[in-house]
């Protein structure tokens, strides 16, 4: 087995989730890196011990482990394609707990089969739920789970409390917390507004339809 000590670990995005992940990694005695469209304040970088990269290419070429914590939008859809993965260190790892479509499905499989990537882990798929014949189920050196791996009983209690607060504020006509806000008055809003780019990512509905076979088709049809 292996451990993280001494490795270069980088996060793609350092918003609420990305920064929290980096803080949790600090006690493991790793060298922490991040890329984000908006650089964190100098005092935060110093406190956590972060090295900033002004491009995702710079980040992935430096780190042995890359964790993806950015939202899915036009600029990040298919970001980890064959070209970007080729810039990663030989034998590096990707952890994707953001969105499945941020990574090119076949590019991940090819990199694992060729040995360029040592491993890929995550709890996000495209389409989701993943059909039985999804290639990520059978590719080598993967650590995939359903998109429920972080849903502990404690987390579910926090989700419920957050939903209740949002509904209570909505019915009372009160302003929502910035961290709970995504869109306001027709525009991006809240603490994560700067993380997105204008436009829409592809719906993926036609691509997803290609995977509708057997149990998956029955499940989709039952939800209509």
Task: Give the label of every model feature segment.
Residues 22, 26, 112-113:
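Gly/Ala-rich phosphate-binding loop of Rossmann-like dinucleotide-binding domains
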Residues 39-135:
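Rossmann-like adenosine-cofactor binding region
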Residues 36:
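Conserved acidic E/D residue at the C-terminus of a beta-strand in Rossmann-like folds
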Residues 1-5, 26, 86-87:
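Short, flexible hinge/linker loops that cap or flank conserved catalytic cores
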Residues 8, 30-31:
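Residues at the starts of beta-strands that form the adenosine-phosphate
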Residues 1-20:
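Glycine-rich NAD(P)-binding loop of Rossmann-like domains
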Residues 126-224:
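C-terminal helix-to-coil terminal segments
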């Amino acid at each position: 087995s292996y451990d993280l000590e001494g490795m270069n670990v980088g996060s793609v995005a350092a918003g609420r989730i990305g920064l929290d992940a980096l803080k949790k990694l600090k006690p493991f005695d790793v060298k922490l890196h991040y890329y984000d469209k908006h650089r964190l304040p100098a005092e935060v970088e110093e406190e956590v011990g972060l090295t900033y990269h002004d491009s995702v290419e710079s980040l992935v070429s430096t780190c042995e482990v890359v964790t993806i914590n950015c939202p899915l939008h036009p600029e990040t859809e298919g970001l980890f394609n064959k070209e970007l993965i080729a810039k990663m260190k030989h034998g590096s790892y990707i952890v994707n707990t953001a969105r499945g479509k941020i990574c090119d499905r076949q590019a991940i499989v090819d990199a694992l089969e060729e040995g360029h990537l040592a491993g890929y882990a995550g709890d996000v798929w495209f389409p989701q739920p993943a059909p039985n014949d999804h290639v990520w189920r059978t590719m080598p050196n993967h650590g995939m789970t359903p998109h429920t791996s972080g849903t502990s009983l404690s987390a579910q209690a926090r989700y419920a409390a957050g939903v209740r607060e949002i509904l209570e504020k909505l019915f009372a006509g009160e302003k929502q917390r910035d961290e709970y806000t995504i869109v306001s008055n027709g525009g991006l809003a809240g603490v994560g507004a700067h993380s997105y780019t204008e436009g829409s990512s592809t719906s993926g509905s036609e691509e997803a339809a290609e995977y509708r076979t057997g149990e998956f088709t029955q499940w989709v049809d039952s939800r209509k």
